[in-house]
Every structure is written in C-alpha cells, then in structure tokens.
C-alpha cells in the first residue's frame, strides 16, 4: 500500500535510507569508487566519471535515483513491504541500485 507519508516521517525515513545505502556501498566497494553523501544527496562516482545520484524529493515524498545504467527513476515508500518501490514497476530502490552497480563494477552488493 503506497500512501503519502507525513512530512517529518518522510524526511527521517528517506535520510536513514540514503545514509544506510551510502554506508553499505562505501564499506563494500569504497576503495574502488567515490562515495559522497553531502546535504542529503548521495553521489557514487565510478572511475569512468559516471555517477549514480540518489536524493529525496520532499514535494512528492519520493526518493529519486539517476543511474548511468537504468536512467532516472522515482521511488515511493510501500508501507506493506517497508521498501521504496519504483513508480514504473515492481523493482525496489535497493534492487535497482544493486543491479546497476553490479553492471558497472562487477560487484554484487546486498543492500537489503
């Protein structure tokens, strides 16, 4: 069930999600890529200069991701599964990012 989140809850949940992704990716492959979290915007830069950018979009209560593999995508929070689900399909933010990072780095990262 996807319902609009109360603003304070959204900010807390989105910030926590982005910070956790930053920590997990940095711990897993931070020696091979540049992971930077600043002002709530997560930038993952590959050696090629390509970037993944993940940030929250408060107006829509979504997390947005820009990926050099899958392009731009938006995610709503699904309370039933406690995950950020794509507005374009059944994929979660964690699944899409893990798949895209595997394509670009050859490393499979468990983000869930």
Question: Where do the PLM segments sit?
Answer:
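N-terminal intrinsically disordered, cationic/polar leader segments
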Residues: 2-112
């Amino acid at each position: 069930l996807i319902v609009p989140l109360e603003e304070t809850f959204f900010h807390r949940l989105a910030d926590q999600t982005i910070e956790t992704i930053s920590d997990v990716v940095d711990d897993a492959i931070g020696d091979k890529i540049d992971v930077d979290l600043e002002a709530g915007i997560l930038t993952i830069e590959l050696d090629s200069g390509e970037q993944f950018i993940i940030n929250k979009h408060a107006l829509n209560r979504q997390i947005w991701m820009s990926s050099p593999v899958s392009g731009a995508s938006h995610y709503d929070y699904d309370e039933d599964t406690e995950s950020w689900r794509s507005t374009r399909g059944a994929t979660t933010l964690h699944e899409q990012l893990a798949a895209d990072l595997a394509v670009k780095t050859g490393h499979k990262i468990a983000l869930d």
